[in-house]
């Protein structure tokens, strides 16, 4: 595997970091659905965060999108208490997603690292949804939302990231 080193000055990196983190909040706050769109864009940003966001801000990037989604529901009237139940697990799965990509890309191609990380994130969320469902805390629809949809939006987010990354690396 050929490795290419790209140098980014600190001012440019700070600019990109601010864009990624801001969009991580704004997209789920301003776009209330469908999950396929918002989830894909958020996953793309989480992946972009592995390249453009300082390590110390990964937790911020992992947390902001779900807070924005809750606020969107409160402000625009589509609030569901069920999302609140998932918040800590969404934060954990997003953080694990970011960190596993960073760890795995040292050992595998980025495409495989992202794919494996998507499945890990989806597993965490599906397992949480399954436990909540078994205890009758959430309706069955959350098994799909936190399972298959996570895989689909993660893969689609990865595809978009790879396209953007290819353009970025050519500049």
What are these regions (language model features)?
Residues 2-52, 56-57:
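Hydrophobic transmembrane alpha-helices
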Residues 34-49, 64-74, 145-146:
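Hydrophobic, membrane-facing alpha-helical anchors
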Residues 56-60, 112:
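Residue-level recognition of membrane-helix boundary sites in multi-pass small-molecule transporters
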């Amino acid at each position: 595997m050929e490795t290419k080193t790209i140098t980014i000055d600190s001012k440019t990196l700070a600019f990109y970091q601010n864009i990624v983190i801001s969009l991580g909040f704004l997209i789920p706050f301003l776009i209330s659905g469908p999950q396929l769109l918002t989830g894909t864009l958020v996953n793309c940003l989480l992946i972009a965060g592995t390249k453009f966001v300082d390590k110390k801000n990964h937790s911020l990037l992992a947390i902001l999108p779900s807070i924005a989604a809750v606020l969107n529901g409160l402000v625009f009237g589509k609030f569901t208490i069920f999302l609140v139940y998932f918040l800590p697990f969404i934060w954990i799965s997003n953080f694990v997603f970011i960190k596993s990509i960073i760890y795995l890309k040292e050992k595998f191609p980025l495409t495989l690292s992202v794919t494996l990380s998507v499945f890990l994130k989806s597993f965490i969320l599906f397992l949480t949804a399954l436990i909540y469902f078994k205890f009758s805390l959430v309706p069955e629809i959350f098994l799909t939302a936190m399972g298959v949809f996570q895989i689909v939006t993660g893969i689609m987010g990865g595809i978009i990231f790879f396209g953007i990354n290819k353009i970025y690396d050519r500049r």
